[in-house]
Amino acid sequence: MKTVFDIRIDFERSHGSFVFDKNTNEEFLDMFCMFSSLPLGYNHPVFDDSFDKKIQSLTRLRMCNNLFDSDELIDFKEAFKEISFHESIHFCSTGALAVESALKCAFEFKKNPAAMVLGIKNSYHGINGWGFMTDPEISSVKNRVIHFPQNDWRHYTLDDLIDYVRDSKEDIASVIVEPIQCTAGDIYLDINKLKELQ
């Protein structure tokens, strides 16, 4: 099977933001694979034997559900609530699945099949299901979804989005926001405008 890059990663010898390539016996700054899904980098010291022992059984069970509690899940929820802005927490396995879950909740709450999902231009919310539909114009997504069904969901600049939300609340099921836009480049949105949108 052909890969995009001719690199064979050695995960044991990779560290921080650097991947070690077995083919060339060199390390490379990883600017593609793990910048958002592995923010602590490869082989961070926090992932020691005690961490591995505690997390091992949970990773085998995929403890990402909201149907029942366990001591481990209760501990995690309490720790997470210390940094969360909201009392209610719903966990999902990936960011793309979290987007889908949030949109399903919005549609069920709104009960209006014609209601739109609004997004900020250049935002990327995953390729699963509805995630890509929030802004299919991003170059890395556009060619992949050109033959997919289209929708009337809109994407605006942050300023235009604020105006649209103010004037058209009844037509909106959800507004989905990516505060730091990585896929379209490092675009950091104005925190004050995000608060105004909220």
Task: Give a label for each model feature.
Residues 1-15:
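Short, basic/aromatic recognition patches
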Residues 75-176:
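PLP-dependent aspartate aminotransferase-fold enzymes
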